[in-house]
Amino acid sequence: MTALNTPEAKAQSRARQFDRLTDESGKYAVSPLPFTYDALEPVIDEKTVDLHYNFHHKAYAAAANRAEEGLAKARDTNDFALVKFYEKELAFQLSGHILHTIYWSNLAGKGAEPQGDLAKSINADFGSYQKLKGQLVAATTAVEASGWGVLGYHPTLRKLMVLQIENHQKLTAWGIVPLLVLDVWEHAYYLKYQNRRPEYVGNLFKIINWNGVAERLDAARA
């Protein structure tokens, strides 16, 4: 078996494909959606997907580029008066870009329960899929203000974990690899659900792409 055909190489290749964050020049850029704007109906309406992708996600990538440019200028001029601002901007905007990239790949599934090694890992770490779902729904719904619910894998601990993220970058745990992210910023659901966040979060499980989540777990373990 050649190095390019090992399970590890294949997992890393998959990770690169569904997590492309930059264009050929190295600038942060948004990849094309893996589905049409109406593909998530009736769970998420076409207008929300359009606005979310074209105006919110793309704005995070553009702002991350501006933050990088600001830091580069600071280094070139040895003027770090605005370093705190640009570091905070980069953490927020780049995290938003990364999480949205994962979010789109997590959707457009059939909503069936996880299978195979992913299901075994869920059972080992949470007791059952239903217990994981209960915790993830509750944690995501309870995020204070804007943020995310995350199912992640910690390679050092070798376990799955559920986390809340406020904004895009707060309350995470170092080393966690996001596998499934649920967006509860209001722009993700307000046109259709208004203040009914619990309904939106529950409905997301009808369209989760668990095969993609399983691929992410394979890549994280490689």
Where in this protein do the model-derived segments appear?
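N-terminal export signals
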Residues: 1-12
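Short helix-capping/linker segments at secondary-structure and domain boundaries
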Residues: 8-9, 105-114, 192-197
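Acidic, low-complexity proline/glycine-rich segments
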Residues: 15-37
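All-alpha RGS (Regulator of G-protein Signaling) helical domain and cognate RGS-like helical scaffolds
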Residues: 23, 27, 55, 66-75, ...
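Pocket-edge structural micro-motifs
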Residues: 32, 53, 164
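Alpha-helical scaffold segments that form or flank carboxylate-/histidine-based iron centers
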Residues: 42-58, 78-98, 167-169, 174-182
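An amphipathic alpha-helical core segment
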Residues: 138-194, 200-211
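Low-complexity, Gly/Ser/Thr/Pro-rich intrinsically disordered linker/tail segments
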Residues: 211-212, 216, 220-222
